[in-house]
Design a protein with these regions (language model features):
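Short hydrophobic/small-residue motifs within alpha-helical transmembrane segments
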Residues: 55-62, 147-149
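Conserved MFS/SLC helix-loop-helix module at the cytosolic interface between two early adjacent transmembrane helices
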Residues: 63-102
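Hydrophobic core of transmembrane alpha-helices in multi-pass small-molecule transporters
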Residues: 22, 91, 102-118, 143
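Extracytoplasmic
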Residues: 12-47, 64-68, 153-157
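Intracellular juxtamembrane helix-capping segments at the cytosolic ends
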Residues: 39, 117-131
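Small-residue-rich segments within alpha-helical transmembrane domains of MFS-like 12-TM solute carriers
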Residues: 25-29, 112-121, 150-151
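Juxtamembrane helix-start elements in MFS-like secondary transporters
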Residues: 45-54, 139
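Glycine-rich segments within core transmembrane alpha-helices of 12-TM secondary carriers
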Residues: 134-154
Length: 162
């Protein structure tokens, strides 16, 4: 039986992962909701390829999930979630500098690995490992944080584009 976790530390852990979720979802899954149309207009790439890049990122996310789970099992969630943030940042940098749609798609493959390593499933797994039978409320709170991703990030994404 897992002991009840220390409340102040637990709140810090949930808030830290929660803010990470807001940024991770907002800079990956929700990004093209705001930026696809300006990207198409400014680059001349087809909308189909821009949206397909996100789809390929999602596919990549699913494909890396078993390996991510093994790494969380072996090393814990902290290094995996941290690596996710780095991968998402690298993917976004590649995306921002993409001279053509092929590089843009490659950026989304990197982002997809970051998504697989850092969105809800790895975060929930991390909380499950940390809190055992007491993880349910932590996961609920984390989900509430993640729900603010579009509310927080869409205006930021739009502002960054202007």
């Amino acid at each position: 039986m897992t002991a009840a976790p220390d409340r102040p530390r637990r709140s810090i852990v949930i808030a830290s992962i929660g803010f990470g979720q807001i940024l991770a979802w907002g800079s990956s899954y929700y990004l093209l909701a705001v930026l696809a149309e300006p990207m198409v207009r400014e680059t001349g790439w087809s909308q189909a390829w821009v949206i397909a890049a996100l789809s390929l990122g999602l596919l990549t996310s699913g494909l890396v999930s078993p390996a991510v789970g093994r790494r969380i099992e072996r090393f814990g969630g902290r290094p995996v979630l941290a690596a996710s943030a780095v991968l998402l940042a690298i993917g976004l940098l590649i995306q921002a500098a993409a001279p053509n749609v092929a590089v843009f798609i490659a950026a989304w493959l990197v982002i997809g690995v970051g998504m697989g390593a850092g969105l809800y499933d790895p975060a929930f797994s991390t909380l499950g490992r940390l809190y055992g039978e007491h993880a349910r409320s932590a996961i609920t709170h984390l989900t509430l944080f993640g729900g603010f991703a579009s509310t927080v990030c869409w205006p930021l994404d739009r502002r960054a584009h202007v």
